[in-house]
Amino acid sequence: MSASIRDAGVADLPGILAIYNDAVGNTTAIWNETPVDLANRQAWFDTRARQGYPILVASDAAGEVLGYASYGDWRPFEGFRGTVEHSVYVRDDQRGKGLGVQLLQALIERARAQGLHVMVAAIESGNAASIGLHRRLGFEISGQMPQVGQKFGRWLDLTFMQLNLDPTRSAP
């Protein structure tokens, strides 16, 4: 699949919204049960921009959004600066074509360029494809939490994975 990875713009928000709401309604990748509107995604976009965090999109030659990825603060406390939690979502009809790998690789490069130290992934434990993608790019499982969420009438387990972006870096 030939896709371009680039910074998202406001014009990409309808495509991002469609992918997000599909994940809400049909997967356990997002633990929300209520779809959001464009104003919600605009507020999210504005917050990421204000914080200096990227939103990347994979797009086809026509500019159509095929997937997106982003990261933000892991926790809102000063001691966690340098650690971010990320998300990668690919449109349903584009999964399995390597877009997740492209997006996550680009996100890792961006995090390293920003001087970040650790990227964290919080993945529903039954999502073997996402766990495999993260393992492929060097993430390791750092914890598991059984039955901490619920969706579609069942309990969800959470797997945490992390990637140390610069293992040789000294503590500040």
From Swiss-Prot:
Gene3D superfamilies: 3.40.630.30. GO terms for molecular function: acyltransferase activity, transferring groups other than amino-acyl groups. Acetyl-CoA binds at residues 88-90, 96-101, 127. It catalyses: L-methionine sulfoximine + acetyl-CoA = N-acetyl-L-methionine sulfoximine + CoA + H(+); L-methionine sulfone + acetyl-CoA = N-acetyl-L-methionine sulfone + CoA + H(+). It comes from the Bacteria. The keyword Glycoprotein does not apply. It is an enzyme of class 2 (transferase). Keywords: Acyltransferase, Transferase. Residues 3-166 form the N-acetyltransferase domain. PROSITE patterns: GNAT. SUPFAM superfamilies: Acyl-CoA N-acyltransferases (Nat). CDD domains: NAT_SF (cd04301). Its EC number is 2.3.1.-. Substrate binds at residues 75-77, 85-87. Disulfide bonds: none annotated. Plays a role in the resistance against the toxic effects of L-methionine sulfoximine (MSX), a rare amino acid, which inhibits glutamine synthetase (GlnA). Catalyzes the acetylation of L-methionine sulfoximine (MSX). Homodimer. This is L-methionine sulfoximine/L-methionine sulfone acetyltransferase. It comes from Pseudomonas aeruginosa (strain ATCC 15692 / DSM 22644 / CIP 104116 / JCM 14847 / LMG 12228 / 1C / PRS 101 / PAO1). The gene is pitA.
